[in-house]
Amino acid sequence: MTAPTDLSPTLQLACDLIRRPSVTPVDADCQAVMMQRLGNAGFKLEPMRIEDVDNFWATHGTTDGPVLCFAGHTDVVPTGPVENWQNDPFDALIDEHGMLCGRGAADMKGSLAAMLVAAERFVADHPNHKGSVAFLITSDEEGPAHHGTKAVVERLAARKERLDWCIVGEPSSTTLVGDVVKNGRRGSLGATLTVRGKQGHVAYPHLAKNPIHLAVPALAELAAEHWDHGNDFFPPTSFQISNLNAGTGATNVIPGDLVAVFNFRFSTESTVEGLQQRVAAILDKHELDWHVNWALSGLPFLTEPGALLDAVSSSIKSVTGRDTKASTSGGTSDGRFIATLGTQVVELGPVNATIHQVNERILASDLDVLTEIYYQTLVKLLA
């Protein structure tokens, strides 16, 4: 295993960013490095620190044409047990197999480096390009995500900022870089359900009301329900119970209440209001004394074939020789906030096989491939 030397500009920058321990919401000066580079390339910089989160918006070009934005996050998830890593997770080493190892290599400091180097090259090659190249970067994607991209998008919307196309650098690829891009994501609707009973002694059930016995049939019906059939772009909406708690810990006490935590990952065939109404109808049918706290993490979004998806797909083809697959699978991303502006959003990044894991790693050479794909996309849309 050797430390990276004589590397491409993209790999040099990726290693610099990985060496900065930017666990959510700490940025560890990753954005300062990026802004300095972008400023030197002629970008107009707008730092936006919101509460404890660092963000920035940067633009290069004119306001009378289309805007292509690169979006991403400098924060990473915790490393887990450091002793289980093959190297220090913030050392950014390239091993004997050519793998770049470190927290954030895939998710998503590698993408940030590729985006930035591609943009530097593009504005140098095409100083009078059409429209604008933009960057929207945050240090709060892996955490609560209240003061990151969501808050920046709200500010951009308030001042009617134009944003036609957006490439989010999330690690979309599965086996080979560019084999999959995300052209949408399911919505995420969470809930905490409380079913109230009456606490009592297990030997005197007639004096109590067991919320477990009452709630289980309703939960079973919710789990068996077919919420929709999906469509050409999305699988059917799914319902999953993630936590179920009741009882005092004593073996002779009927609990007074039951708490169930569940989540919908829903397609564009369902609405938040529709799902909530159907849940309420099932709970009422079982005559439960219930209360639900709902938490919407994001609405579903979809970018159908058009200028952005066509440019990304053809760039992948020209650089790698491979056809890409557009998919809406997986969890949520900050693309859900950007899509509210009416923006076409595509996620394209490295292979995601080891994200959030111990020994997170990607093939180092993939970042140079990704840089070229980003560059070719810029050329197709703005040159």
From Swiss-Prot:
Cofactor(s) this protein requires: Zn(2+); Co(2+)
Cofactor annotation remark: Binds 2 Zn(2+) or Co(2+) ions per subunit.
Catalyzed reactions per annotation: N-succinyl-(2S,6S)-2,6-diaminopimelate + H2O = (2S,6S)-2,6-diaminopimelate + succinate
Gene3D superfamilies membership: Zn peptidases
Keywords: Amino-acid biosynthesis, Cobalt, Diaminopimelate biosynthesis, Hydrolase, Lysine biosynthesis, Metal-binding, Zinc
Entry annotation: catalytic residues: D75, E141
Known role: Catalyzes the hydrolysis of N-succinyl-L,L-diaminopimelic acid (SDAP), forming succinate and LL-2,6-diaminopimelate (DAP), an intermediate involved in the bacterial biosynthesis of lysine and meso-diaminopimelic acid, an essential component of bacterial cell walls.
Lineage of the organism: Bacteria, Pseudomonadati, Pseudomonadota, Gammaproteobacteria, Pseudomonadales
An MF annotation (GO) of this entry: acetylornithine deacetylase activity
Class in the EC hierarchy, top level: hydrolase
Binding site for Zn(2+) 2: D107, E142, H356
Subunit structure: Homodimer.
Family according to the record: Belongs to the peptidase M20A family. DapE subfamily.
Protein name: Succinyl-diaminopimelate desuccinylase
